[in-house]
Amino acid sequence: MKKFIAIVSIIVILVILFDTCYYRLGLYIDFQPQKEVTTFIKTEDDKILLNKGDGYKEFEIKGVNMGSGIPGEWSTDFAIDKETYLRWFDQIKDLGANTIRIYTVQNDTFYNAFYEYNHENPDPLYLIHGVWVNDYVLNSHRDAYDEKFFDTLLEDSKTVVDVLHGRKKINLGRMASAGHGTYN
């Protein structure tokens, strides 16, 4: 029995250690370092080009800005449910928009609804994802080239990318005005 408890304890500790290193600290091993990075969107001069499988063609952003709040609730409560997001996405598409801009990491309900909507539609909505910038820093004696400001912005940008690719977990309050969880 002692051997069983010791083995289970070691396994639990290893799982917690892996979770902390991979999802919280963002440490991971690239098993394919030589793999070419591919993308379906790029820029040339002042044009945005999108590849839908038939080569790169010019893409015009027709977008809608979306926050995380709903009337009667605090925006940090992330009170919008999946059905509401799906309804909004339909309405946004009906407006003729093809892109949604969000200003910071949302909760998992948004990303799950966004994935579901795009997965079920041949003409998807695209996402422009922002990174929250501290207003105090912007309006104080510091500027965008201040080392501490720049380092924080760079770290938060990396965190957003890692969260969106399912490589990092964040908790409410880790980033200003951010949701929580991992999304993939």
Indicate residue ranges for each PLM-predicted region.
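Hydrophobic alpha-helical membrane-insertion segments, chiefly the h-region
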Residues: 14-24
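Alpha-helix N-cap and loop-to-helix initiation/capping positions
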Residues: 80, 144-155
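Active-site-adjacent substrate/metal-binding segments within catalytic domains
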Residues: 26-119
